Amino acid sequence: MALSVIRNNHIIFVLKQIGVRTKHRENNNSKYVESFTCDELERYIYSNPDCTLFETLKDEEYYSNVRVFFDVDMDGRLDDKYQATHNFVNIITKFVADYAYNDCKMISNHRDKDKMITDMKSNFSITESTDKEKTSFHLIFFNCYTTLDTLINMRKKLIVLTKESNNRLVKAIDTSVYRHKPSLRIVGTKKDSINIHVHKKTKQNIHFKNYLFTYVDYNEEDCYYFVSEQQHQSPDLLNWKEEYIPFHDAIKKISKAIGNSIINLKDITAENFTVTPLDIYYATPCNLCKKVSHKHPHHLLISNDCIRIYKSGNPNSCKIKTISLEGNKLFSISQQIIDLNVINVSDRGEYLVWLKNVWRMCEDDNNITKLILYMRDHLSSDCTDLLLCPRNRKVIEHNLKDMLIDTIETDTYPEKLQFLNGVYDIKDSIFYQGNDAKKFVCTVSTGYKYEEGINVDDITTELMSILDDIQPKTKENFENRELYEQILSSCLMGTTKQCIFFFYGETATGKSTTKKLLKSVMHNMFLETGQVILTEQMDKGPNPFIANMHLKRVVFCSELPDFSCNTSKKIRSDNIKKLTEPCVVGRSCYSNKINNRNHATIIIDTNYKPVFDKVDNAIMRRIALVNFKTHFTNTKKKVHNSKYDFIKPLNESLDSKIQSNYFRYAFLKILLGWFSKYHVPNLRILPTPDKIPDFKFRLKVESLIIPSNSTHVKYVDKLMKLGYITDDDGIPVLQLNIFQQKLSLHFNVKLYGQDIDSFIMKNKKYMNLADEYMSFIFIEDLNTINEPRNT
């Protein structure tokens, strides 16, 4: 434990290989460790040019003062090494000075931060790796001292600096070296026996000792020394914190650890325990090291929320015992995580975590566990070891769930498209990253990273040519092409669509190619489902097809059956209506979540014209159809088919390009352009009932007749001459058989006889038990009786 008064250290403790075990360090096994003065160490390296040596602290509990140091490791070389290093030193010296004066206690008498920066720039050593394939060096400020715990605390802010800085060397700083038992390769030595590269001096006039971070030669006039606030107060000035276990419980743990009787135990209080030596009566050997007794007494001190029992005199002659004072450290960790606003619960009871700068949904508990491990860089250093234990992580996980009370609304940003590295605003063309994206809580992501500024102009031109073949930009196909662009670009928007869309055409007309391109762009937001969502009844029972639609932005249903077959089920009109509602009811197996938010553009890929079990105005307002009339083939035979407008050669390499996501960013760029063209400021897609054969009867009927009402009473006398009768209210109506005869004059009975009968069955009314009538008036009859008035 470092004290407020710094003591010099001229003995360098070295490891002779990486990963020396603790027992070899403690036993001073000369095969693995050795101690040198600076001159001895320099001579040893000169005599053993192939040696591997790493300097480290021998006993951090006893002594942990070090020089401020940085380790940089980057692949590749710098074009302007001098200027890059100069900029790096400027950034780092300011960072160290800011941290020392703003977050720490400056023990030395210096109060001028600018002078400290200037002095650091004049008093540093820097090594250089002989490896020409990488940029690697150690930077040591030999006039700037601190403690290891202070460097560990500094690591959090250094991580932030490395993430936010644009300097390549700053980004390449290895922050993992700031830990307990750190080691740094000594200048002039190899990493291992296989590696031929070493770190060499860059300035021969700088003494060898100034290339060592554990060498301490402190001078109050010329050197700087700072420690963290908590460490500066420890041990004598640190008060007993409220969150610690009760003091008498701590004394009980101390007594148990000592084993022997503590004669002055009653004299020890929370105010004096750090300055009162323990008077131990050794009835049995020491419980810590098993020696018969000790000449010097044991003492207590506080460090990192722990009581440490150490022996005065030679502290290495007895083991140091550590007793935690935290009442519930795991709960404290949970509270720190909650305060960072990185975990929430949705109104569906699903947990969301902010992990690697994106919101992720926890379908199981794996993401919460990953979050806990990921937070180790954002928690205090004494918490990180606790996170390594799986049992501790499970406790923290349950704590987090129990501490979340209020649910939050999610996915309320229809114009936001989430990627793995941020959120893209498709309306304003802005890409949000990091904390800027955090406010947009989107639980479903495309599953890949957005590449900003990527040049895809050539690929876009190639892809646009393919799309122009699938849906030609001709005068005859203008409306079809426009609807095609509107539908595809609507997939980007996370809101309920007013229509279901049919892609209708023969085989090899580009429907599947369109689907694959959409899947490449939308990826995890794309769902391919079966025809059951259209033909089977939708209820609250298990329906994984519907449950998987939750928050998806594209749902593709391929290959509807041939409706001309008697065994084929027709499309249920009720299902169409439900699929255009904001909430679709259906649950996964073994799940109670039945309400699924419907943000999808639902596209039906079919070779057969759709047929519905019933047709009304509501269903006609919900259907749009795109015809695909370009046939792609490489056959040498001529293709004669009235259903094709164009015959184009088949590109056999197209599938492999799409599957490799070759067109991903190009198609995304095209979709964004179409979105701005059609859907800003509002989403706009109109139905096309006139393209659906099943709707033609209904559309024609509506152009022939109108429902009769009280406004037609004044025409009763004239209408009765045309075969009309009156109902109980005096409103003109037609007898059922006369209505059927008049309607049949406008239709081919062989084609539409069943539709006529179905319409009559649905709308007929009864005057009495025997007489049936239809409460409609033919528009042509109204025109006939009004003609004389107009003349």
From Swiss-Prot:
It comes from the Viruses. Its EC number is 3.6.4.-. Residues 479-641 form the SF3 helicase domain. GO terms for molecular function: ATP binding; DNA binding; helicase activity; hydrolase activity. The active site is at residue 174. It holds the Pfam family D5_N. The keyword Transferase does not apply. Residues 346-471 are annotated as: Primase. Keywords: ATP-binding, DNA replication, DNA-binding, Helicase, Hydrolase, Nucleotide-binding. One of its GO terms (biological process) is DNA replication. InterPro entries: DNA_primase/NTPase_C (IPR004968), Helicase_SF3_DNA-vir (IPR014015), P-loop_NTPase (IPR027417), Phage/plasmid_primase_P4_C (IPR014818), Viral_Helicase-Primase_Cplx (IPR051620). ATP binds at residues 505-512. Coiled coil: none annotated. Interacts with A20. Belongs to the poxviridae D5 family. Primase which may have roles in initiation of DNA replication or lagging-strand synthesis. This is Primase D5. It comes from Fowlpox virus (strain NVSL) (FPV).
